Swiss-Prot record:
Keyword S-adenosyl-L-methionine: no
Swiss-Prot/TrEMBL GO biological process terms: regulation of DNA-templated transcription; regulation of RNA stability; regulation of translation, ncRNA-mediated
Its biological purpose: RNA chaperone that binds small regulatory RNA (sRNAs) and mRNAs to facilitate mRNA translational regulation in response to envelope stress, environmental stress and changes in metabolite concentrations. Also binds with high specificity to tRNAs.
Keyword annotations: RNA-binding, Stress response
UniProt keyword RNA-binding, yes or no: yes
Listed name of the protein: RNA-binding protein Hfq
Gene it is expressed from: hfq
Lineage, opening ranks: Bacteria, Pseudomonadati, Pseudomonadota, Gammaproteobacteria, Enterobacterales
Length: 87
C-alpha cells in the first residue's frame, strides 16, 4: 500500500460508512456534491441523483459537508472543553 493511501482510505471510508455528504472540487474548478458510494485506488463513486465515477487524479479537494447535528456536537465539544479563567 502506498503511503498516500494510508491517509486517503480511512478518511474516505469514514465518509462512506457514515454517509456524510461531501463536496468534491475538481482541478478544473467544478464542484460535485453527493455521498461517497465506493472508492478504490484510482476512482471515487459519488452518488446523488445519479452515480458518477470520478478519477482521483481529477480531484483537487474533498470537503465533508457538516449537518446540523455535527455542528451541534462540535459546539458542545467546544463548550465542554473551554478554558475557565479564574480572577
Amino acid at each position: 500500500m502506498a503511503k498516500g493511501q494510508s491517509l486517503q482510505d480511512p478518511f474516505l471510508n469514514t465518509l462512506r460508512r457514515e454517509r456524510i455528504p461531501v463536496s468534491i472540487y475538481l482541478v478544473n474548478g467544478i464542484k460535485l456534491q453527493g455521498y461517497i458510494e465506493s472508492f478504490d485506488q484510482f476512482v471515487i463513486l459519488l452518488k446523488n441523483s445519479i452515480s458518477q465515477m470520478i478519477y482521483k487524479h481529477a480531484i483537487s479537494t474533498v470537503v465533508p459537508n457538516h449537518t446540523n447535528n455535527q455542528e451541534h456536537n462540535q459546539s458542545q465539544y467546544n463548550n465542554n472543553n473551554a478554558c475557565i479563567s479564574k480572577p
